[in-house]
């Protein structure tokens, strides 16, 4: 049984109850939305994961990517990244490791967080293929499905799988004038496999078998966007939309099978086209939860892509995205370190709050009101507590403390609030 099959059978699970309480929404509404596929609760049956609801009418959620590379293999650092992610309010984590002993790294991350954990199995599939056959693109169906099953048994809560790349998708790509080609690493493995071997994508041709496997462990399928644009110049082009059409069809098959599913979206989109992308996805995928990387509305901010991501992410979430994948200052430059993780997460959480306020979320507005009252009352401790990052403003105030205890060192005795308050007392 999965969260979706239970919901379809009018069964309210403890995970649905938890999400309902967290969102301050009637649990029967949560059940109905899970049954229809509008909300997912990624939680593998083998793991004691903190339940998180992702979908329409819920708060915008934020994911943190972490993981090793072939150039930097430090399990302890990845564990610290996972701990920082939970400490600073991430809703989920993805282990994207490609260097070192991947099963051991995954095991340690699963052990050191209660958050839902996702993976991209194609990374491990490619490495196993290289070790066995000499190239990452020479994998066979046994390697693919054995890897997916093994990760499911380990407790992975959601998996990004590039099921929508087909021979027809690649024909569309080859006939397009796209500048950057395929920038998705997992998507590139599948694309190269199809082009070299002239075979169909096994994740597409064996999709029903894949669903049986995921259903057994209640792994949420995150349909990867292997044809996502890698730069603004390629946004909303035919390869991207062709794949999205296929993903919409696969969403229907997931729902029929009782497998929870969400859909991943583009990472580079000009600001004036963000809303269009969200509406296209929500229409083609029948309101499946939408998971976006950023998106980045400019490609010229290397070293500051957490800021561009927050700008694009706020508009994306306001326009329909439900799950924001953070972007760190290290994006497009190097592997992220712990400080990058913290900064990227905070920026993405700001975007989520901005969007939730704009959408009228009652919990988001309640926090804004609390902050207004705390500022009116010069309650600095409460302001720090309510801040998305409470540590930084505390340190900043300590670095240059005000002479007037209630004020800050910008206005001091000329604080507008204090001035009017004093005048009112006379």
From Swiss-Prot:
Catalytic activity: 5-amino-1-(5-phospho-beta-D-ribosyl)imidazole + S-adenosyl-L-methionine = 4-amino-2-methyl-5-(phosphooxymethyl)pyrimidine + CO + 5'-deoxyadenosine + formate + L-methionine + 3 H(+)
Pfam families (UniProt xref): ThiC_Rad_SAM
Coiled coil: none
Binding site for substrate: 65, 94, 123, 162, 184-186, 225-228, 264, 291
Gene Ontology terms: biological process: thiamine biosynthetic process; thiamine diphosphate biosynthetic process
Cofactor binding: number and manner: Binds 1 [4Fe-4S] cluster per subunit. The cluster is coordinated with 3 cysteines and an exchangeable S-adenosyl-L-methionine.
Residues at which Zn(2+) binds: 268, 332
Single GO MF descriptor: 4 iron, 4 sulfur cluster binding
Key words of the record: 4Fe-4S, Iron, Iron-sulfur, Lyase, Metal-binding, S-adenosyl-L-methionine, Thiamine biosynthesis, Zinc
Annotated [4Fe-4S] cluster binding sites: 408, 411, 415
Cofactor: [4Fe-4S] cluster
Recorded metabolic or biological pathway in which this protein acts: Cofactor biosynthesis; thiamine diphosphate biosynthesis
EC number(s) reported in the record: 4.1.99.17
Family: Belongs to the ThiC family.
Job of this protein: Catalyzes the synthesis of the hydroxymethylpyrimidine phosphate (HMP-P) moiety of thiamine from aminoimidazole ribotide (AIR) in a radical S-adenosyl-L-methionine (SAM)-dependent reaction.
HAMAP family: ThiC
Full protein name: Phosphomethylpyrimidine synthase
Source organism: Methanococcus aeolicus (strain ATCC BAA-1280 / DSM 17508 / OCM 812 / Nankai-3)
Gene assigned in the entry: thiC
